[in-house]
Amino acid sequence: MFRLYFFFNVICIFLAIRSAIGGEVPDATEQKINNFLASGKDSEDLSKRAAAMWFGPRLGKRTIASELHDEMMDEIDDNPLYYSGESPQRVASEIAQGTPYVVLLLTGRVLRQPQPVFYHSTTPRLGRRDASSSNENNSRPPFAPRLGRNLPFSPRLGRSFGAPVVDNFAY
């Protein structure tokens, strides 16, 4: 294992020395500028490209074209999030066709109402309460018990009637 690392390091050092002696290799930006100059296009366009390459990519929120956005939203609204393929019953019947024996796992039907299907465009508005929760009493009790204490509030700070009075403290 040591020999492998040794030969790898020797090869890396050899390549580093060879590239240093061989001359400076232009980076990709310089090559692009040289190719652009050789093509003979406007120098004004070259300065715009060079500035864009110098400052890097544009940061911030990129907007989608309105037509593309509308098409995407229509496609999302047409397909509910829960299931968008063939019905499971149809797929099962196609699989079971032509087989002599089929094992079916049946589940009981749930007697509750089916849940409404939510689409992508219906999102809850955070920070808003619906009308059903506005009728609830959200006020605190007069004294909130802390650390599991269920005793009523006593403003006397630990003193109570009938407790022994401590006058002498042992240090």
Curated annotation (Swiss-Prot):
Coiled-coil portions: none
Residue numbers spanned by region Disordered: 120-151
Example of a GO MF term: neuropeptide hormone activity
Maturation-removed propeptide residues: 23-47, 63-111, 160-171
Cellular compartments annotated: Secreted
First and last residue of the signal peptide: 1-22
Residue numbers bearing the Leucine amide modification: 59, 126, 147, 157
Keywords, comma-separated and alphabetical: Amidation, Cleavage on pair of basic residues, Hormone, Neuropeptide, Secreted, Signal
Main location: secreted
GO BP term, example: pheromone biosynthetic process
Keyword Secreted on entry: yes
Pfam families noted in UniProt: PBAN (PF05874)
Annotated GO CC locations: extracellular region
Function: A hormone that controls sex pheromone production in females and pheromone responsiveness in male. Also mediates visceral muscle contractile activity (myotropic activity).
Family stated for the protein in its record: Belongs to the pyrokinin family.
Protein name (Swiss-Prot/TrEMBL): PBAN-type neuropeptides
Native species: Aedes aegypti (Yellowfever mosquito)
